[in-house]
Structure formats: structure tokens, C-alpha cells
Regions:
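A hydrophobic, multi-pass inner-membrane permease signature
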Residues: 1-293
């Protein structure tokens, strides 16, 4: 057998070593910031911390979870991510189902596809988008964060290709013969079969919503409505500890680097927790949604 040959064994060993090195490169920064967050300010500021805490302390974590501003931003980030993911999945699913039909079933399908690809490559720009959001009365609301990017064309094309290649046409035709409508076919045939693609698109959307900070900085005038990513950007980039709501003595006792590390790790934690539950669908969704027979 070919998998018993020497060439195949060498190739397998190389793959395993390469993946182990790649995994270490991805994991080591997280371990480092976690170690810094549990270290005392002096060794952290002196760059003495590598992958294990020095002079272990939880002061940075106590300060992070002890102030209402951070907890409010954490809740805003979770709410924005959940709402944005649900809206995006709903709109993308409906659009992908319609666009997956043949030209004879959906007149003007090609025109819509060309328009979607065009706006994916050439968007309206920051200022026109801001003016549109302002005229719609969405400034300083959660809708300004989730509606402008609700239909991601890349995710739409991924799900569209899955609908066209992964759902047997015979099932759809049989359902039509039995008198089923489009919504029944979508919810009872397409969606159950398309769980891998939906999980993939949902993961992409979730990561994008959770990590997005620039739109919050533009559209939100009230800092109490900032999602966690925008909140962290304000503190980390501008070194603005006033939003931590601590007195000067506590600020002196803290290290900006330890607090920043704790907050960065917390910011990455939700996606790290969610990913293992979607992993079994992820690879299958990418493969089936990116090829066409």
C-alpha cells in the first residue's frame, strides 16, 4: 500500500512536525500574555516574563473584572456579536437560497450576482457610508454596528456554492411535486443539509463581529455603548486608564502591561471557547462551499 512506503512516511512525519510548529507559533503568544497578566508589575515591565508568571498575582484580573466599565463593554460585545451573527445568517441564507436557483427560475439572477461582486470589490467608502448611517438615524445605536455589514458577499458566495452543489436537486423537485413552498423547502431541506456551511459562515461572522472595533469608534458617540473591542482599543492604543474607573493609587500599583494582557486574553477567550464546538463542521463547510462539480 502507498501509505506504507518510505516516501509517504517521510511526508507524514514532515506534516506532523510542521503542524506542531505551526500550533506552537499560534499558542505561544496566548500563553505569554496569560503569564504576563498573572505577573507582578515590575518583572512584566522589565520584560522578564516569558511563558510562566513571575511573582504570581491576580491584581490585574481583579481590576479588570472589578470595574463596571469593562463588564459593560464585555456585555455590549457579546450582544453585538450574537445579534450581528443572527441577522447576518438570516439575510445571507435567504439571499443564497434565491441566488442558487437557475436563471429560468430567477429572472435577473446574473445581474444581482454582478452587483454583489462589484460592491464586494468596490465599496461606497467611509464618508458616504457614515452619511447614510446618519441619515437613517442609526448613529449611537447598536444597529449602526450590525446592519451595514449584515450581508458579507464572501460568506454569501460560500453558502451559495454549497446550496448549488451540496443539496440534491431531486429532493427539491420531489418537495415541489408534493406541494411544498419555497420556505418549507428552505427550512426542511436546505438548512438541515447545510449545517456545515452555516457553521462555517457563522464562525466567520462571529469572529468579524467580535473583533471589529473601528465601526464602534466611528458610529458610537457614547463610550458606555462601546463593545469590548472598541473599549480595549481606546485603553490600549491611547493608554487611557480613565475608563477603568480606578483611583490614582490603584493605577500606580498596576502595570499597564499586565492589565492590557489580561484584557487581550479575555478578548480572545470567547472565540477560543466557541471554535471547538464548530470545528467538526468547519473544514467540511469550507471544502463543500468552495468547489463546484
Amino acid at each position: 500500500m502507498h501509505y506504507r512506503s518510505r516516501t509517504y512516511r517521510i511526508f507524514s512525519v514532515f506534516n506532523i512536525v510542521f503542524l506542531l510548529v505551526l500550533s506552537a507559533i499560534c499558542i505561544m503568544p496566548l500563553i505569554h500574555i496569560l503569564a504576563v497578566s498573572f505577573s507582578a508589575p515590575a518583572p512584566a515591565n522589565a520584560n522578564l516574563v516569558r511563558f510562566w508568571p513571575v511573582d504570581f498575582t491576580v491584581s490585574a484580573w481583579e481590576q479588570t473584572f472589578g470595574n463596571q466599565n469593562f463588564l459593560r463593554a464585555l456585555w455590549n460585545g457579546v450582544f453585538r456579536t450574537v445579534l450581528g451573527t443572527v441577522i447576518s445568517l438570516a439575510t445571507i441564507t435567504l439571499a443564497a437560497y434565491a441566488l442558487s436557483k437557475e436563471d429560468r427560475e430567477f429572472k435577473g439572477r446574473k445581474m444581482y450576482m454582478y452587483a454583489l461582486v462589484f460592491v464586494m470589490l468596490f465599496n461606497g467608502g467611509l464618508i458616504p457610508t457614515y452619511i447614510l448611517v446618519q441619515n437613517l438615524g442609526l448613529i449611537n445605536t447598536i444597529w449602526a454596528l450590525v446592519l451595514p455589514g449584515a450581508v458579507n458577499v464572501f460568506n454569501l458566495i460560500l453558502l451559495l456554492n454549497f446550496f448549488r452543489t451540496g443539496v440534491p436537486k431531486s429532493l427539491e423537485e420531489a418537495a415541489f411535486i408534493d406541494g411544498a413552498g419555497h420556505f418549507q423547502i428552505l427550512f426542511k431541506i436546505y438548512l438541515p443539509i447545510s449545517l456545515p456551511a452555516l457553521a462555517t459562515v457563522g464562525l466567520f461572522t462571529m469572529v468579524g463581529q467580535w473583533n471589529s472595533w473601528f465601526d464602534g469608534l466611528i458610529y458610537l458617540t457614547d463610550s458606555t455603548k462601546y463593545p469590548l473591542s472598541t473599549f480595549l482599543q481606546t485603553i490600549i492604543v491611547q493608554n487611557d486608564f480613565s475608563q477603568l474607573n480606578v483611583n490614582p493609587d490603584e493605577v500606580k500599583a498596576l502595570s499597564e502591561r499586565t492589565v492590557r494582557s489580561a484584557q487581550i486574553f479575555i478578548g480572545a477567550l470567547p472565540i477560543i471557547i466557541v471554535y471547538p464546538f464548530l470545528q467538526k463542521y468547519f473544514v467540511k463547510g469550507i471544502v463543500l462551499g468552495s468547489v463546484k462539480e
